[in-house]
Amino acid sequence: MKYATDYGYEIKPVYGPGDVADMEYERDLGDPGSFPYTRGYHENGYRSRMWTQRMTAGLGSSSDANKVLKKYREMGQIGGMCVIHDRVSSSCIDADHPLAKRENGVLGWPGSSLLEFEELMQDIPLTGQSITVLGCSAPSTLRLAYVVALAEKRGIDPTEVHGSVFESPFGNPFGQTDAQPFDLNMKLFLDAAEYVARNKIRMRGGLVGQHFQESGGNNAQALAIELSMLKEICGRLVDERGLEFEDAVRVPYQLVSIGSRFFEEVAKVRALRRMWARMAKEHFGAKTEKACQLLIAVHTSGRTMTYQQPLNNVARCAIQTLAGAMVGCTALDNATLDNAYAEPSALAARMSLNTQHIVASETGVADVVDPHGWFLFRRKPDQRG
Protein backbone atom coordinates (compact mmCIF):
# COMPACT_ATOMS: atom_id res chain seq x y z
CA MET A 1 0.00 0.00 0.00
CA LYS A 2 1.28 3.44 -0.92
CA TYR A 3 1.00 6.20 1.68
CA ALA A 4 0.77 9.63 0.09
CA THR A 5 -0.82 13.04 0.40
CA ASP A 6 -3.86 13.85 -1.70
CA TYR A 7 -1.50 15.49 -4.20
CA GLY A 8 0.73 12.42 -4.51
CA TYR A 9 3.65 13.26 -2.22
CA GLU A 10 4.93 10.11 -0.55
CA ILE A 11 4.57 10.01 3.24
CA LYS A 12 7.34 8.41 5.28
CA PRO A 13 6.46 6.17 8.24
CA VAL A 14 8.32 8.42 10.67
CA TYR A 15 9.92 11.87 10.62
CA GLY A 16 12.87 13.20 12.61
CA PRO A 17 15.24 16.17 12.96
CA GLY A 18 16.88 15.39 9.63
CA ASP A 19 13.65 16.18 7.80
CA VAL A 20 13.78 19.80 8.98
CA ALA A 21 17.55 20.26 9.00
CA ASP A 22 17.35 22.97 6.33
CA MET A 23 14.66 24.92 8.17
CA GLU A 24 15.53 28.19 9.87
CA TYR A 25 13.14 29.19 12.63
CA GLU A 26 13.07 32.95 12.06
CA ARG A 27 12.99 32.61 8.27
CA ASP A 28 10.48 29.79 7.89
CA LEU A 29 8.33 29.91 11.03
CA GLY A 30 8.81 32.88 13.31
CA ASP A 31 6.93 33.46 16.54
CA PRO A 32 3.17 33.97 16.37
CA GLY A 33 2.59 37.57 15.36
CA SER A 34 5.95 37.80 13.58
CA PHE A 35 6.91 37.57 9.90
CA PRO A 36 6.40 35.29 7.95
CA TYR A 37 3.36 34.50 10.13
CA THR A 38 3.48 30.74 9.57
CA ARG A 39 2.37 30.30 13.18
CA GLY A 40 -0.36 32.93 13.07
CA TYR A 41 -0.93 36.68 13.11
CA HIS A 42 -1.63 37.26 16.81
CA GLU A 43 0.88 36.55 19.54
CA ASN A 44 -1.91 35.60 21.95
CA GLY A 45 -4.01 33.72 19.39
CA TYR A 46 -7.51 32.80 20.49
CA ARG A 47 -6.81 34.12 23.98
CA SER A 48 -7.24 37.63 22.60
CA ARG A 49 -9.87 36.87 19.95
CA MET A 50 -11.89 33.68 19.51
CA TRP A 51 -12.74 32.70 15.95
CA THR A 52 -16.21 33.59 14.63
CA GLN A 53 -18.40 30.52 15.13
CA ARG A 54 -21.26 30.59 12.67
CA MET A 55 -23.53 28.59 10.37
CA THR A 56 -24.57 29.47 6.82
CA ALA A 57 -28.29 30.21 6.37
CA GLY A 58 -30.46 30.68 3.31
CA LEU A 59 -33.67 28.89 2.33
CA GLY A 60 -37.17 30.04 1.53
CA SER A 61 -38.20 33.67 1.82
CA SER A 62 -36.29 36.51 3.43
CA SER A 63 -38.55 36.13 6.45
CA ASP A 64 -37.72 32.41 6.64
CA ALA A 65 -33.98 33.11 6.47
CA ASN A 66 -34.38 35.80 9.15
CA LYS A 67 -35.94 33.25 11.50
CA VAL A 68 -33.07 30.83 10.87
CA LEU A 69 -30.48 33.52 11.60
CA LYS A 70 -32.22 34.35 14.88
CA LYS A 71 -32.36 30.66 15.74
CA TYR A 72 -28.62 30.34 15.13
CA ARG A 73 -28.02 33.25 17.49
CA GLU A 74 -30.10 31.47 20.13
CA MET A 75 -28.02 28.32 19.56
CA GLY A 76 -24.85 30.23 20.39
CA GLN A 77 -23.59 31.56 17.07
CA ILE A 78 -20.66 33.81 18.01
CA GLY A 79 -19.19 36.83 16.26
CA GLY A 80 -21.00 36.87 12.95
CA MET A 81 -23.72 35.70 10.58
CA CYS A 82 -23.57 34.18 7.12
CA VAL A 83 -26.21 33.96 4.38
CA ILE A 84 -25.96 32.58 0.86
CA HIS A 85 -27.77 33.98 -2.19
CA ASP A 86 -30.16 31.76 -4.14
CA ARG A 87 -29.46 30.89 -7.77
CA VAL A 88 -31.98 33.40 -9.07
CA SER A 89 -30.27 36.36 -7.42
CA SER A 90 -26.83 34.97 -8.24
CA SER A 91 -27.83 34.83 -11.90
CA CYS A 92 -29.05 38.46 -11.82
CA ILE A 93 -32.64 37.41 -12.53
CA ASP A 94 -35.38 39.38 -10.82
CA ALA A 95 -37.44 37.37 -8.35
CA ASP A 96 -40.74 38.03 -10.18
CA HIS A 97 -39.40 37.00 -13.61
CA PRO A 98 -41.00 33.81 -15.05
CA LEU A 99 -37.56 32.15 -15.14
CA ALA A 100 -37.39 32.47 -11.37
CA LYS A 101 -40.71 30.78 -10.64
CA ARG A 102 -39.36 27.45 -9.39
CA GLU A 103 -36.01 28.67 -8.06
CA ASN A 104 -36.82 31.52 -5.67
CA GLY A 105 -35.45 30.72 -2.24
CA VAL A 106 -34.01 27.38 -3.35
CA LEU A 107 -30.44 26.77 -2.19
CA GLY A 108 -30.23 30.27 -0.78
CA TRP A 109 -31.83 33.56 0.15
CA PRO A 110 -33.84 35.41 -2.57
CA GLY A 111 -32.08 38.76 -2.33
CA SER A 112 -33.12 40.65 -5.43
CA SER A 113 -34.08 43.92 -3.73
CA LEU A 114 -33.25 46.17 -0.79
CA LEU A 115 -36.65 45.29 0.69
CA GLU A 116 -35.61 41.62 0.76
CA PHE A 117 -32.41 42.56 2.59
CA GLU A 118 -34.34 44.67 5.10
CA GLU A 119 -36.62 41.69 5.81
CA LEU A 120 -33.60 39.41 6.12
CA MET A 121 -31.99 41.74 8.69
CA GLN A 122 -35.17 42.52 10.65
CA ASP A 123 -34.18 42.87 14.35
CA ILE A 124 -30.62 41.72 13.57
CA PRO A 125 -27.82 44.22 14.30
CA LEU A 126 -25.51 45.43 11.53
CA THR A 127 -22.73 46.18 14.01
CA GLY A 128 -21.11 44.13 16.72
CA GLN A 129 -20.81 41.13 14.41
CA SER A 130 -19.51 40.37 10.92
CA ILE A 131 -22.09 40.44 8.12
CA THR A 132 -21.32 37.87 5.42
CA VAL A 133 -23.46 37.29 2.32
CA LEU A 134 -22.11 34.70 -0.10
CA GLY A 135 -23.04 34.39 -3.75
CA CYS A 136 -21.82 34.79 -7.28
CA SER A 137 -19.74 37.71 -8.47
CA ALA A 138 -22.18 39.54 -10.72
CA PRO A 139 -24.58 40.84 -8.01
CA SER A 140 -21.70 41.75 -5.69
CA THR A 141 -22.28 45.48 -6.11
CA LEU A 142 -25.96 45.01 -5.24
CA ARG A 143 -25.14 43.22 -1.99
CA LEU A 144 -22.70 45.97 -1.06
CA ALA A 145 -25.32 48.61 -1.88
CA TYR A 146 -27.84 46.83 0.36
CA VAL A 147 -25.48 47.00 3.33
CA VAL A 148 -24.60 50.67 2.81
CA ALA A 149 -28.23 51.68 2.22
CA LEU A 150 -29.56 49.79 5.25
CA ALA A 151 -26.81 51.19 7.47
CA GLU A 152 -27.67 54.73 6.41
CA LYS A 153 -31.39 54.03 6.91
CA ARG A 154 -30.66 52.88 10.47
CA GLY A 155 -28.48 55.92 11.12
CA ILE A 156 -25.26 53.90 11.19
CA ASP A 157 -22.02 55.06 9.58
CA PRO A 158 -21.28 52.40 6.89
CA THR A 159 -17.65 52.36 8.02
CA GLU A 160 -18.82 50.80 11.30
CA VAL A 161 -20.15 47.71 9.50
CA HIS A 162 -17.72 44.91 8.75
CA GLY A 163 -17.91 41.58 6.96
CA SER A 164 -17.97 40.36 3.36
CA VAL A 165 -20.68 40.72 0.75
CA PHE A 166 -18.93 40.50 -2.62
CA GLU A 167 -16.92 37.79 -4.36
CA SER A 168 -14.33 37.58 -7.10
CA PRO A 169 -15.36 35.86 -10.35
CA PHE A 170 -12.66 33.19 -10.08
CA GLY A 171 -15.01 30.79 -8.30
CA ASN A 172 -17.62 30.88 -11.06
CA PRO A 173 -16.20 28.02 -13.19
CA PHE A 174 -16.16 25.70 -10.18
CA GLY A 175 -19.78 25.05 -9.32
CA GLN A 176 -21.38 28.50 -9.11
CA THR A 177 -24.33 29.63 -11.20
CA ASP A 178 -23.27 32.79 -13.00
CA ALA A 179 -24.10 33.40 -16.64
CA GLN A 180 -22.39 36.79 -16.86
CA PRO A 181 -19.14 37.23 -18.85
CA PHE A 182 -15.93 37.01 -16.86
CA ASP A 183 -14.79 40.52 -17.85
CA LEU A 184 -18.07 42.03 -16.63
CA ASN A 185 -17.88 40.12 -13.36
CA MET A 186 -14.31 41.25 -12.83
CA LYS A 187 -15.23 44.89 -13.49
CA LEU A 188 -18.11 44.73 -10.99
CA PHE A 189 -15.89 43.11 -8.37
CA LEU A 190 -13.16 45.72 -8.84
CA ASP A 191 -15.77 48.50 -8.72
CA ALA A 192 -16.97 47.23 -5.35
CA ALA A 193 -13.43 46.68 -4.10
CA GLU A 194 -12.30 50.17 -5.11
CA TYR A 195 -15.38 51.72 -3.50
CA VAL A 196 -14.82 50.09 -0.10
CA ALA A 197 -11.08 50.79 -0.20
CA ARG A 198 -11.46 54.48 -0.99
CA ASN A 199 -14.34 54.99 1.45
CA LYS A 200 -12.71 53.03 4.31
CA ILE A 201 -15.66 50.63 4.50
CA ARG A 202 -14.66 47.41 6.23
CA MET A 203 -16.42 45.05 3.83
CA ARG A 204 -14.21 42.48 2.16
CA GLY A 205 -14.29 40.66 -1.15
CA GLY A 206 -14.15 36.89 -1.00
CA LEU A 207 -11.58 34.89 -2.94
CA VAL A 208 -13.17 31.49 -2.53
CA GLY A 209 -10.61 28.75 -2.94
CA GLN A 210 -13.19 26.48 -1.36
CA HIS A 211 -15.11 26.25 -4.65
CA PHE A 212 -12.07 24.86 -6.44
CA GLN A 213 -11.30 22.26 -3.80
CA GLU A 214 -14.93 21.20 -3.41
CA SER A 215 -14.96 20.59 -7.18
CA GLY A 216 -12.15 18.05 -6.90
CA GLY A 217 -8.92 20.01 -6.51
CA ASN A 218 -6.28 18.74 -4.11
CA ASN A 219 -4.56 20.73 -1.37
CA ALA A 220 -1.51 21.71 -3.42
CA GLN A 221 -3.65 22.86 -6.35
CA ALA A 222 -5.93 24.81 -4.01
CA LEU A 223 -2.96 26.59 -2.46
CA ALA A 224 -1.67 27.56 -5.90
CA ILE A 225 -5.09 28.82 -6.99
CA GLU A 226 -5.55 30.83 -3.79
CA LEU A 227 -2.20 32.61 -4.14
CA SER A 228 -2.81 33.26 -7.85
CA MET A 229 -6.18 34.86 -7.09
CA LEU A 230 -4.65 37.09 -4.43
CA LYS A 231 -1.86 38.20 -6.74
CA GLU A 232 -4.25 38.93 -9.60
CA ILE A 233 -6.81 40.89 -7.57
CA CYS A 234 -4.28 42.98 -5.66
CA GLY A 235 -2.34 43.58 -8.88
CA ARG A 236 -5.42 44.84 -10.70
CA LEU A 237 -6.45 47.11 -7.84
CA VAL A 238 -2.97 48.65 -7.81
CA ASP A 239 -2.31 48.79 -11.55
CA GLU A 240 -5.80 49.45 -12.96
CA ARG A 241 -7.52 51.29 -10.12
CA GLY A 242 -4.56 53.25 -8.78
CA LEU A 243 -4.80 52.08 -5.18
CA GLU A 244 -1.83 51.86 -2.88
CA PHE A 245 -1.06 48.23 -2.07
CA GLU A 246 -1.74 48.86 1.63
CA ASP A 247 -5.29 49.94 0.68
CA ALA A 248 -5.82 47.22 -1.92
CA VAL A 249 -4.80 44.40 0.40
CA ARG A 250 -7.50 45.34 2.92
CA VAL A 251 -10.14 44.11 0.47
CA PRO A 252 -9.62 40.38 -0.18
CA TYR A 253 -10.08 37.55 2.24
CA GLN A 254 -9.57 33.86 1.55
CA LEU A 255 -12.25 31.24 2.21
CA VAL A 256 -10.55 27.85 2.30
CA SER A 257 -11.96 24.35 2.46
CA ILE A 258 -10.78 22.07 5.25
CA GLY A 259 -11.15 18.34 4.62
CA SER A 260 -10.40 15.27 6.70
CA ARG A 261 -6.69 14.84 5.91
CA PHE A 262 -5.90 16.55 9.17
CA PHE A 263 -2.18 17.30 8.98
CA GLU A 264 -2.29 18.29 5.31
CA GLU A 265 -5.11 20.75 5.95
CA VAL A 266 -3.20 22.42 8.78
CA ALA A 267 0.00 22.53 6.73
CA LYS A 268 -1.86 24.06 3.77
CA VAL A 269 -3.08 27.08 5.72
CA ARG A 270 0.26 27.58 7.48
CA ALA A 271 1.91 27.57 4.04
CA LEU A 272 -0.68 30.00 2.69
CA ARG A 273 0.11 32.52 5.42
CA ARG A 274 3.86 32.27 4.89
CA MET A 275 3.75 32.36 1.09
CA TRP A 276 1.37 35.32 1.04
CA ALA A 277 3.54 37.26 3.51
CA ARG A 278 6.55 36.79 1.27
CA MET A 279 4.61 37.66 -1.88
CA ALA A 280 3.24 40.82 -0.26
CA LYS A 281 6.70 41.97 0.77
CA GLU A 282 8.81 40.79 -2.17
CA HIS A 283 6.40 41.24 -5.09
CA PHE A 284 4.19 44.11 -3.96
CA GLY A 285 6.68 45.88 -1.70
CA ALA A 286 4.43 45.88 1.37
CA LYS A 287 5.38 48.67 3.77
CA THR A 288 3.49 47.49 6.85
CA GLU A 289 3.12 44.24 8.77
CA LYS A 290 -0.66 44.42 8.37
CA ALA A 291 -0.30 44.31 4.59
CA CYS A 292 1.48 40.96 4.89
CA GLN A 293 -1.39 39.40 6.82
CA LEU A 294 -4.29 37.62 5.12
CA LEU A 295 -7.72 37.19 6.65
CA ILE A 296 -8.51 33.48 6.37
CA ALA A 297 -11.93 31.96 6.95
CA VAL A 298 -12.60 28.23 6.93
CA HIS A 299 -15.49 26.10 5.72
CA THR A 300 -15.40 22.42 6.51
CA SER A 301 -15.71 20.24 3.42
CA GLY A 302 -19.21 19.64 2.11
CA ARG A 303 -18.03 17.09 -0.44
CA THR A 304 -16.85 14.74 2.33
CA MET A 305 -20.34 14.61 3.86
CA THR A 306 -21.76 11.34 2.51
CA TYR A 307 -25.36 10.49 1.66
CA GLN A 308 -24.83 6.98 2.99
CA GLN A 309 -24.62 6.56 6.79
CA PRO A 310 -24.98 10.31 7.41
CA LEU A 311 -24.35 10.04 11.16
CA ASN A 312 -20.70 9.33 10.31
CA ASN A 313 -20.58 12.91 9.03
CA VAL A 314 -20.67 14.11 12.64
CA ALA A 315 -17.22 12.58 13.17
CA ARG A 316 -15.92 14.03 9.90
CA CYS A 317 -17.20 17.48 10.84
CA ALA A 318 -15.52 17.27 14.25
CA ILE A 319 -12.15 16.31 12.74
CA GLN A 320 -12.34 19.12 10.19
CA THR A 321 -13.47 21.66 12.78
CA LEU A 322 -10.50 20.79 14.98
CA ALA A 323 -8.17 21.22 11.98
CA GLY A 324 -9.76 24.59 11.20
CA ALA A 325 -9.26 25.70 14.78
CA MET A 326 -5.65 24.50 14.79
CA VAL A 327 -4.72 26.74 11.86
CA GLY A 328 -5.73 29.94 13.63
CA CYS A 329 -8.64 30.89 11.37
CA THR A 330 -10.67 34.08 11.72
CA ALA A 331 -14.07 32.46 11.13
CA LEU A 332 -15.37 28.95 10.71
CA ASP A 333 -18.52 27.49 9.14
CA ASN A 334 -19.39 23.81 9.49
CA ALA A 335 -20.96 21.48 7.00
CA THR A 336 -23.76 19.42 8.55
CA LEU A 337 -24.52 15.71 8.79
CA ASP A 338 -27.37 16.09 6.25
CA ASN A 339 -25.29 18.23 3.88
CA ALA A 340 -25.41 15.64 1.08
CA TYR A 341 -29.16 15.70 0.62
CA ALA A 342 -30.82 18.65 2.37
CA GLU A 343 -30.57 22.10 3.86
CA PRO A 344 -29.56 21.77 7.51
CA SER A 345 -32.27 20.54 9.84
CA ALA A 346 -32.50 22.23 13.23
CA LEU A 347 -30.84 19.22 14.86
CA ALA A 348 -28.03 19.05 12.28
CA ALA A 349 -27.34 22.79 12.58
CA ARG A 350 -27.28 22.62 16.37
CA MET A 351 -24.88 19.65 16.33
CA SER A 352 -22.50 21.39 13.92
CA LEU A 353 -22.51 24.65 15.87
CA ASN A 354 -22.07 22.77 19.14
CA THR A 355 -19.11 20.97 17.57
CA GLN A 356 -17.39 24.35 17.31
CA HIS A 357 -18.27 25.18 20.92
CA ILE A 358 -16.86 21.84 22.12
CA VAL A 359 -13.65 22.24 20.12
CA ALA A 360 -13.23 25.79 21.42
CA SER A 361 -13.92 25.12 25.08
CA GLU A 362 -13.17 21.45 25.80
CA THR A 363 -10.13 20.41 23.74
CA GLY A 364 -7.60 23.02 24.85
CA VAL A 365 -6.89 23.99 21.24
CA ALA A 366 -7.61 27.65 22.05
CA ASP A 367 -5.29 27.72 25.05
CA VAL A 368 -2.00 27.75 23.12
CA VAL A 369 -1.09 29.65 19.96
CA ASP A 370 -0.24 27.30 17.08
CA PRO A 371 -0.42 24.07 19.11
CA HIS A 372 0.42 22.18 15.93
CA GLY A 373 3.81 23.90 15.85
CA TRP A 374 5.60 20.95 17.47
CA PHE A 375 6.95 22.74 20.53
CA LEU A 376 3.87 21.98 22.63
CA PHE A 377 4.01 18.32 21.64
CA ARG A 378 7.66 18.19 22.62
CA ARG A 379 7.20 20.02 25.92
CA LYS A 380 4.21 18.04 27.22
CA PRO A 381 6.04 14.69 27.52
CA ASP A 382 9.00 16.48 29.16
CA GLN A 383 6.66 17.92 31.78
CA ARG A 384 5.34 14.45 32.53
CA GLY A 385 8.80 12.84 32.56
Say what each PLM segment does.
Residues 282-283, 303, 314-318, 322, ...:
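Hydrophobic alpha-helical bundle architecture
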Residues 144-145, 274, 316:
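A generic alpha-helix surface/boundary motif
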Residues 188-191, 229, 271, 275, ...:
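A non-catalytic, amphipathic alpha-helix used as a structural packing/dimerization or gating element
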Residues 217-223, 259-271, 300-314, 342-352, ...:
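Short glycine/threonine-rich loop-to-helix capping motif typified by GTGT followed
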Residues 330-385:
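Active-site or pore-adjacent capping/gating segments
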Residues 295, 301, 310, 321, ...:
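Catalytic alpha/beta core domains of metabolic enzymes, predominantly
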Residues 1-265, 283-286, 290-297, 325, ...:
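Catalytic alpha/beta active-site cores
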Residues 271, 277-285, 319-326, 330-334, ...:
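Hydrophobic alpha-helix feature that most strongly marks membrane-spanning transmembrane helices
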